[in-house]
Amino acid sequence: MLQIKSISKRYKTGDFVQQALDKVSLNLRDSEFVAILGPSGSGKTTLLNIIGGLDRYDDGDLVINGISTRQYKDRDWDSYRNHTIGFVFQSYNLIPHQTILSNVELALTISGIGKADRRERARKALEKVGLGEHINKKPNQLSGGQMQRVAIARALVNDPDIVLADEPTGALDSRATDELLDLFEKINDSGQTILMVTHSVKAASRAGRILFIRDGQVYHQL
């Protein structure tokens, strides 16, 4: 379980200080599907990045399975990201000249896993997202929804405890959005926690819990 305890984050540009997060507290339970809903500039992506270890908080604490991260070094954050977190972003960030199998396999290259095992794990991840018959295709041969599924497979290939998704449906049409949210529900049913940032009420409604964020504060939840 993750506990976010009164976390604040500020960004400084010269003499200007922007309060991105203001004493945010919440618990993220195991095997939960949570949506963070809010407008642009509300702090939702900053919160996601801090939970994922991509950004550092200024005040408060992020507690991982009962352990404070206040004294975490870079290597601790690296280990946390590599073993606990899978990231899905709105932009697919796929390498265009490589097959989707190779794109997913790349996520395992720094893990010390042998090539044959990497390829097998990448294949299984693509099968899990419904792309088992497309593993030798390149990104430009896929639809937007399919490319986002490749990005999800890449996030799943390390078998993370938590999947963090930042506006994953933002570039998709209505049908592809519904299919992607169906997939997230399936992943969540298998036991993985999903935290999804979105500005779409429709997308957020598919989650088991919705956190409403505005001006850097979580002001309501359903």
Predicted features and spans:
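H-loop (His-switch) and adjacent beta-strand-loop-beta switch element
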Residues: 210-222
